[in-house]
Amino acid sequence: MFDQATSMGDGIAEDRNHCGSNSLCRDRGRESKSRTEVGNRSPVQSSTDTPGTSASTPTSSSEDGHDKLLGVDPDYCRRILVRDAKGTIREIVLPKGLDLDRPKRTRTSFTAEQLYRLELEFQRCQYVVGRERTELARQLNLSETQVKVWFQNRRTKQKKDQTKDTDKRSSSTSESLATCNILRLLEQGRLLSVPAPPPNPLLAHPHPGNGSLLGSPSVSTSSGVSSSTTPPGAGSGTFGLSLSSLSGTPPSPRLGVPPPSLCFTMPLLSGAHHELPSGYGCGTSAFEPYMRIERKDGELGGKKTVS
């Protein structure tokens, strides 16, 4: 009994061990298969199949990185050389979407006959649309787009010409107004200007015996007050006014000659000499008027005491 039981138990254990070894073999086989599949796949496919990793970017990024490592720009970029303001040349990477190398559009060259017909139509009507434009393009062997663009450019040119004409007219008008104003001011100044008075014969031709009135040197007294010489025919106690003071134009003194003193005698306009009392004559001292007043006061005081 016990032998059979042990033999049965050993068989079950062997079966279990066999089953366990088979499961391990199966797991190992699966792992080896997965490894071989991963090894056979390309790096791009493996990166796309494994989410959550840094290699899960699109294929372009990997290609860009590969191009950068190789020093080659990607297909959508291009390099150009630019000279800055300082004269240094720099290399700039720009996207090809800008299309900098696009050839310029060729300008349409019109013949003399076409220009003549287009100009006639423009003088007739500045806007040609519809059937008229189609017919004109057919007659001139041009496309409607070319005719339309020509009329647009012609209208723009006409506006520019009109603007220039108006600017020139306004500038010329302002210049003419300024010129008229200047001429008017000059005319007013000429009319308002007072003619110069005639020269004084007495000053121009002095008496040969006595010399010029202004040119005669003044004689200084002991008190320091200067007095001028008196012309003939005038008394020592006379006092007059000069013609130059009446006319309002003072005579210009000569260089090196002191100005005339305040006390001088000149005949008046009437020619008569109005003699003043000797008490009001010119004295030799600047303090004489005060002395005269004191003398009068003393005389009045003496009269009062006598009376």
Swiss-Prot record:
It is found in: Nucleus. Residues 1-70, 155-175, 197-254 are annotated as: Disordered. It holds the Pfam family Homeodomain. It comes from the Eukaryota. The keyword Cell cycle does not apply. The keyword Nucleus applies. GO terms for cellular component: nucleus. Residues 25-38, 159-170 have a biased composition (Basic and acidic residues). Expressed in the anterior neural keel and later in the preoptic area, optic stalk and ventral retina. Residues 46-62, 202-249 have a biased composition (Low complexity). InterPro entries: EMX-VAX-Noto_Homeobox_TFs, HD, Homeobox_CS, Homeodomain-like_sf, HTH_motif. CDD domains: homeodomain. PANTHER family: HOMEOBOX PROTEIN EMX-RELATED (PTHR24339), VENTRAL ANTERIOR HOMEOBOX 2 (PTHR24339:SF34). Belongs to the EMX homeobox family. This is Ventral anterior homeobox 2. It comes from Danio rerio.
